[in-house]
Amino acid sequence: MNDIKSGEKKRLYLYDNLKFLLIVLVVLGHLIDDSTVKLFGDGGGETGVPQAKVFSGAFVFLYAFHMPLFLFISGLFNRGHDDGRKVLGKTLGFVVIGMLMKCLNYWSQVRFQTDFDRENSDGEIFFDLLGGDGVYWYMFAMAAFMGLCYLLRNSRPWAVLTTALAAGYDPSVGDEYELSRIVVFFPFYYCGYVLDPEKVAEFVKKWYMRVLSLGVIGIWAYFCFEKTKLVYPLRMLLTGRNSYFSISEATDMDCTFLSRLLVMGISALLCLAVLGIGLDVKIPLITKCGSRTLQVYFWHRTIVYMLTYYGYQAYLAKAFPERWELYLALTAIPIVLVLCIKIFGVPLDMVLKGIRGRNDIIKENGNGK
């Protein structure tokens, strides 16, 4: 979700346009999360807001590719992993933003806690410095990915995939330090890191890629919305948070590394398909917003908490009983457009510029080599 820096080269609008689509889907995923019908496993169930089975299918559909593709695109453009000083600066930037986001998330949960949550929660909301399952995981994961690429710059790619598959056997690899998602999603970032963005863009522009992409997306949509019970067990794998044992215990699926490999294969295929339908042209408003996704991601969860607190989902279900699901889904678009306004990016720019400035001082003093 970081801005693309293309230097003197022509900017590849394909990725900005895709980032706009993906951030809309990220916001959509969090808007509908509480409205998914619980089939089995984690997620869904009684949450105090109206629910619809279509959102259970939509959740699986979205989570199969939206974060993997975001991380792949981030890997494409986060260069400079061979320069330890640059890596340190970028890593610190994401850690600081992640901590700020964790504080914002905690405040939002406390301030906008609904009566249902208050009555049905296991206890008070507490601030977890090292763990938690909030959206801030992405910031800490990005910091870890940059550091890992620096450490593994001379390693073979197969080692990255092997580690991701093996991690599921360790039940201690979970939300603590965001370890599970860091390990599970790193291969997608790493693939972007080792590939060239221009060559990727050139490949997906081929006419047959458009046709194949539409076919792949259509088939996945069919399974998600028409055969929801068949693919819904994959939900716990798609979030990247759960061990194989916990998934097997919560579902009828005998989860192993092959299950993870299957899901990663589905995600990789869908990422390629979504890349294949992207447009490499400058689209008014959309392309600009696609370059500001970091600020949208930082603030959007607070907006979702606020809408739930004030009964937005319940209002839609009552006022538009036949179409409330559609209107709830469309709400993601204005949220993204509003949060793309430049003022929402000012705090993040101040943090990143401050860290870059500090890094330059270290370099001038001869300590950043």
Residue ranges with predicted function:
Residues 1-369:
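Alpha-helical transmembrane segments and their immediate juxtamembrane cytosolic regions
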